Amino acid sequence: MANNYTRYKFYVIGVGGTGSLLARDLPKLLLGTSHKMMLVDGDTVESKNIERQGYQAQDVGDNKALALSRKINSLYPIECEFDDKYCTYESLFALIQDDKGYVPVIIGCVDNDATRMILEKVFKKLDDVIYIDSANSEYEGNIYITTKKDGIQQSNLRSQCYKFDLDKHPLDVSCQEQAAKGNVQFLVTNAKMAVSILEHCNALIMYQLKEGVQLVNRFETVFYDWSYTW
């Protein structure tokens, strides 16, 4: 997919449970490189987000992408850009076109198939692109890694494996619907998803990325020794 002169720009779409934890560590991979990153999310930090996402009390009321990019830019000598609006096809495609010197790496950390359809549409429009799409429930998840070089696609997109739900884009969801959504997730699951995505980003930078699907189970590598008595 790449050679030693490839420059990547990582677009983290959705900086909630998984995306905010990924964004916290992704800058460390970019230190000393010419790669760039951008956070995209139209959501606002709420006090309930502090427990499971990468935000602190001083961030409450701020846009999530803005709050995280502000932290990253203060901690690391890289430029983390942000877009404080929910992702649309037109907005994401325009952002990518503005940085044509970079191969876009679209990282989907969203919780709705309506946005996934947008991300796949952008992927299909581009000739050179990497798409890392994550999804998880309370205890497990999966990551689809699909690439395209000179218009040739490697591995399947999520929608090519199963039918998407006809859910709503965040822009079309009312405040009441958002409050009633009740999408239960856990910090440990989100953290494991974020680390798994980070591994794929590292593999990409090291020119070792493999396309396909990764299944992530938060209990897979947890071992219990019942012989010990407290």
Indicate residue ranges for each PLM-predicted region.
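Conserved acidic residues
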Residues: 84-88
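Active-site catalytic pocket residues across diverse enzymes, especially alpha/beta-hydrolases
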Residues: 26-30, 54, 123, 205
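Short amphipathic alpha-helix with an adjacent loop that forms part of the alpha/beta core around
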Residues: 90-101
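Glycine-rich adenosine-cofactor-binding loop
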Residues: 6-30, 38-46
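Conserved beta-strand segments of alpha/beta enzyme cores
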Residues: 36, 79-81, 130
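Glycine-rich phosphate-binding loop and adjoining beta1-alpha1-beta2 segment
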Residues: 36-77
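Glycine-rich phosphate/adenylate-binding loop
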Residues: 2-9, 16, 101-105, 109-230
